[in-house]
């Protein structure tokens, strides 16, 4: 039955690896439609610091699932899977190929493998956890998570109360850890997926790209964009939107906790750390074809051949 399923392409990669450029070039050759797989690009008013595709790029290749939420709102992997599947089905109905582009690996994993059934939020238990945090501190609760679920504790920072609270809540409701429950796969993706990842061969080149992009963001007005968010008064640094790399560091600057130069340096370092995590995740990914950021033409040919060969096999 697999050959009857529609084709979908995944184009993954670390930040600043050239995913957007390659995706736009591919769309100019083939009937593909782009779906963003990025937990930062979903937010309106956060354009410069997320390196969101600009107006020209959006005209060349419109991206779905960009600018869909206000920065005050949360968005889960389950929300993404629902929205991405709906977009993929629309694209296939138009006789085109969904091309999913981004660097949020959790979203790709949720889409590909489905999501395990987690218990619904419990307001009473959540309130109890928050009260404990007020009296003991989040670091003590993180130590508790470390004892019951060291895998989740390694992924969740002590200063990330939303995710830390949820991990403890899940355990207290179900008696099972978040790690145990997420190992149970949900409904698989009803598509034939060809998966690609793009990155520079050398880490130093990726670091250079990250620093260059951050400098360009500052020149483009990232500080002004951040000030507009800061002065809204309905945002705070614990929101998922403001925890995005670059935004958290610039928020600290506006809060008076560091200088602008320190915020820029910390933002670049945080982006490098994000890229390292993305690459580590991709190296453990199955059925993945690697592409070279420094050879866009060859990468484009590899993607084109994958589409052409799939068409030939379906004839």
Swiss-Prot record:
The top EC class, named as a word, is transferase
Binding-site residues, ATP: 13-20
Return one Gene Ontology term, BP aspect: tRNA modification
Would I find ATP-binding among this entry's keywords? Answer: yes
| Keywords annotated in UniProt | ATP-binding, Magnesium, Nucleotide-binding, Transferase, tRNA processing
GO function terms (MF aspect): ATP binding; tRNA dimethylallyltransferase activity
Entry's SUPFAM superfamilies? Answer: P-loop containing nucleoside triphosphate hydrolases (SSF52540)
The residues listed in the UniProt record as binding substrate, with positions renumbered to this chain, are 15-20
Catalytic activity from the UniProt record: adenosine(37) in tRNA + dimethylallyl diphosphate = N(6)-dimethylallyladenosine(37) in tRNA + diphosphate
Segments for region (Interaction with substrate tRNA): 38-41, 162-166, 243-248, 276-283
- What EC number(s) is this enzyme filed under? 2.5.1.75
InterPro entries annotated for this entry? Dimethylallyltransferase (IPR039657), IPT (IPR018022), P-loop_NTPase (IPR027417)
Say which domain of life the source belongs to: Bacteria
Cofactors needed by this protein, per the record, are:
Mg(2+)
Residues annotated as site: Interaction with substrate tRNA: 104, 126
- PANTHER family registered for this protein in UniProt: TRNA DIMETHYLALLYLTRANSFERASE (PTHR11088:SF60)
User: Could you tell me which HAMAP family the record lists for this protein?
Assistant: IPP_trans
| Function comment | Catalyzes the transfer of a dimethylallyl group onto the adenine at position 37 in tRNAs that read codons beginning with uridine, leading to the formation of N6-(dimethylallyl)adenosine (i(6)A).
Q: How does it assemble?
A: Monomer.
Family stated for the protein in its record: Belongs to the IPP transferase family.
In its UniProt entry, what is this protein called?
Answer: tRNA dimethylallyltransferase
Gene that specifies this protein:
miaA
């Amino acid at each position: 039955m697999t050959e009857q399923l529609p084709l979908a392409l995944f184009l993954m990669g670390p930040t600043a690896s050239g995913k957007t450029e390659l995706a736009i070039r591919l769309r100019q050759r083939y009937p593909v439609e782009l779906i963003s797989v990025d937990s930062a690009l979903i937010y309106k008013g956060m354009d410069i610091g997320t390196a969101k595709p600009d107006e020209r790029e959006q005209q060349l290749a419109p991206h779905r699932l960009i600018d869909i939420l206000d920065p005050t709102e949360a968005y889960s992997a389950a929300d993404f899977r629902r929205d991405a599947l709906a977009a993929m089905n629309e694209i296939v109905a138009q006789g085109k190929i969904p091309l999913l582009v981004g660097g949020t690996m959790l979203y790709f994993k949720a889409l590909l493998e489905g999501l395990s059934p987690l218990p619904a939020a419990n307001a009473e238990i959540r309130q109890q956890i928050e009260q404990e945090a007020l009296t003991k501190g989040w670091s003590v609760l993180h130590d508790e998570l470390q004892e019951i679920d060291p895998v989740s504790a390694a992924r969740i920072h002590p200063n990330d109360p939303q995710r830390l609270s949820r991990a403890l809540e899940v355990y207290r409701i179900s008696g099972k850890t978040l790690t145990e429950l997420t190992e149970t796969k949900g409904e698989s993706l009803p598509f034939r997926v060809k998966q690609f990842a793009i990155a520079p061969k050398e880490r130093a080149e990726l670091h250079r790209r990250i620093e260059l992009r951050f400098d360009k963001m500052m020149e483009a007005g990232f500080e002004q964009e951040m000030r507009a968010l800061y002065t809204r008064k309905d945002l705070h640094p614990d929101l998922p939107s403001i925890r995005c790399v670059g935004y958290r560091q610039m928020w600290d600057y506006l809060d008076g906790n560091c200088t602008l130069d320190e915020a820029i340096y910390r933002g670049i370092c945080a982006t490098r750390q994000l890229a390292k995590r993305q690459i580590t995740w991709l190296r453990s990914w199955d059925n993945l074809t690697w592409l070279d950021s420094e050879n866009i033409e060859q990468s484009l040919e590899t993607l084109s051949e994958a589409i052409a060969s799939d068409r030939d096999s379906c004839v």
